[in-house]
Amino acid sequence: MGSSPPPYYADLGKKANDVFGKGYHFGVFKLDLKTKSESGVEFTSGITSNQESGKVFGSLSSKFAVKDYGLTFTEKWNTDNTLATDITIQDKIAAGLKVTLEGTFAPQTGSKTGKLKSSFANETVAINTNVDLDLAGPIVDVAAVLKYQGWLAGAHTQFDSQKAKFAKNNFAFGYQTGDFNLHTNVDNGKDFGGSIYQKVSDKLDCGVSMKWSAGSADTLFGVGAKFALDADASLHAKINNKSLIGLGYQQKLRPGVTLTLSAAIDGQNFNAGGHKVGVALELEP
């Protein structure tokens, strides 16, 4: 049995990012529903109400797979009245290769977009490309990650053909094992970041994150943790050097029903208010 492939560039540091991101829904009420028809069509719908702006956003998508041909068709719609279609073929052109054609259309404005995405991964390398199909000139994204004995090295570049210049030049280095991840990155030579993930025990996951920019004294540093109370409940907590505190509680009420409660507290201005709470309910078969 071969080793697992390296992560794609966008997924570097994902385990640490999940410690800081999953289990929190500050300032919103959210409902997600997933169902599957007898014919195999998967439906996903969601609605989010922003407490501050009062805006309600909803989305609906359907996904159908033709497994014999490696094809997946996805249709999407949202309350901004944007329609989207994705067609994906995987492992048929070549083993490990996935190609997706995406298109969006906004009827009220007539705006159309198209993207051609591809990704390939084996035990040593993970490569993905993203071409924005703009008639005025495509924007091309290319990223690659190499893996050697747990060590990771990645690069991401974006070329804007309309302006005939590179818009992004990013690099990342890291190391990962099953229960430990180290990630560092440099974006455009001026923005720096790093994260550490450690699975301390079967119940406790911890993360550390740091970001700063050249020429700026403003550094963002945070620590976070997830603790599993049991198989169906978990606690989440995080804090950064600006005294912003995040707390979350996630409970599986019954199979297919998960409730998440979260709160964001401004520790520097505790008495001034402005704290945020959030509630999310996920339903799936």
Residue spans of the language-model regions?
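Detector for outer-membrane/organellar transmembrane beta-barrel domains
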Residues: 145-228
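Outer-membrane beta-barrel strand-turn architecture
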Residues: 37-39, 66-68, 79, 91-95, ...
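Transmembrane beta-barrel domains of Gram-negative outer membranes and organellar outer membranes
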Residues: 1-141, 148-150, 156-159, 179
